[in-house]
């Protein structure tokens, strides 16, 4: 089906078009497209002659000579990008538009979504110059040297409520009491945490102050660039101190700093110890302690860190907190503070990672630039992958006594995540690939026809070799059936070879397969080809649990069961269909793809085509994803996680 966005364009086009792609989806879409516009021919990356679906296959140059106004690319998103890269220069030169079947303009450059246009820039070199002029460098603590992996400080109170399983009052009552008590005890002085809880109307028997402190410590991380500034100051012989508005004691602040490997602080001025804050005299005490020293204070709050320091005769330099940077961008504008806690934690992990560095203005542009592969995995990919694994586990709970098969190579990282989230669940990493499944599973003429529908970019000799593992130089010509057309000429040879590979593959699967247990089969993004052919090799019932199923209509007559994380309806509306190929690249293992199995049931791998730098990049992204998973469950129990695909997509896209 063509989509309304493309339909609108086709109605208004004044001229001819060509379609790029000769697969089954093209055949399906041609009649609808032809209702609106004249199709002059079909384009393909490997062929520029012949006829299919009633249209000539032509070259791009010929299409240009005919005078086409547009090209409609009917292919998967990853293929669309590769096609556009190949043809965009000629199309731009000849004013030819390129659209996909969804109506997206494929020549349109995507603009950066995340810019710092709202914020006034500052530069690290300016701060370092000010440091050179000072004797004592004072650092704010929270949001400066350290930050919380939370969307809001108030999320801490909800975490405390959940941890203590408080049923005597509602969450809202608890949070309101906690905030109200902090505000009332702060009037005229700087309270400590015990005093705040003493004024709360809570039942006794629990040390709320200690429990809150423990949770807070668990969600605090360093702001790396500012810790580097601190270490620079110490190495230059400057005296480093901390001046902080806090309800924690000096001892507790020191404990937090030590836990985050922040050392070398000569003195900590905690407002709770002096019963006064930065705006009520704490800086005056600092000034008095260093009467003849030039002091520079670094902090994130304009009033308490910048204005109050200057008022006390102390130079000050304001930096942005992670929260400042987040709200200063145009990223995810519809984030709401009243969303579910697990979603807020996702955003908190994102903010504390992406905006950890306060010195983001070193480039001329104000775009946020991610140059660390681990950050890509941690902040952008991990939330969606974690939610998928949670969904997958929920589906396995619906199946009594099932075995879990995580198919290669996409199942490699999924298995690692499973072992972190559900360490007591047994999973099997199953070696397979579309090539291995086809070579061992093509046992009938119908199977050959199914495989032949997947258009192959090469001649017959190459097709036989790559798809079926058959060396044309070793073929007995007596087995070639000249009464048939195309690939069916080699039917006898293909099926004969497949039976050998089938028996070898079965030996491998027998080592894994648990008798009398249904199989839940993971594939990431697929039509179902591997599952279809593997189903022939095991007696067990198989149900597929996919991230996304492509072209499900091709499996309608194959009697295989597949359920997807993203439904067909969601896929149409979702941006994930445009971006899944990125995730597919990331999930992979570090072994080459398996081609087939030997007589002992051992894998025979294809030649590795990825470069070392490609594998290094994948490793770093995967490390980021695994770190995110560990950080999330440290803060929030996976059992209570509610899947939020909308938020995951916002983050990824």
Residue ranges, per PLM feature:
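Hydrophobic, well-ordered beta-alpha structural blocks that scaffold small-molecule cofactor pockets
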Residues: 1-110
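Short amphipathic alpha-helix with an adjacent loop that forms part of the alpha/beta core around
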Residues: 10, 57-67, 123-130, 284-288, ...
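Short glycine-rich phosphate-binding loop at a beta-alpha junction
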Residues: 17-20, 72, 138, 245, ...
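Short, aromatic/basic amphipathic alpha-helical patches
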Residues: 31-35, 53-55, 82-93, 254-261, ...
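Substrate-recognition "cap/lid" segment bordering the active-site pocket of phosphatases
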Residues: 49-52, 241-243, 247-294
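Long, low-complexity, Lys/Arg-enriched
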Residues: 94, 102-109, 285, 293-298, ...
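Active-site neighborhood of HAD-like aspartate-dependent phosphohydrolases
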Residues: 128-176
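Short, acidic loop-to-helix structural element flanking the phosphoryl-transfer center
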Residues: 190-242
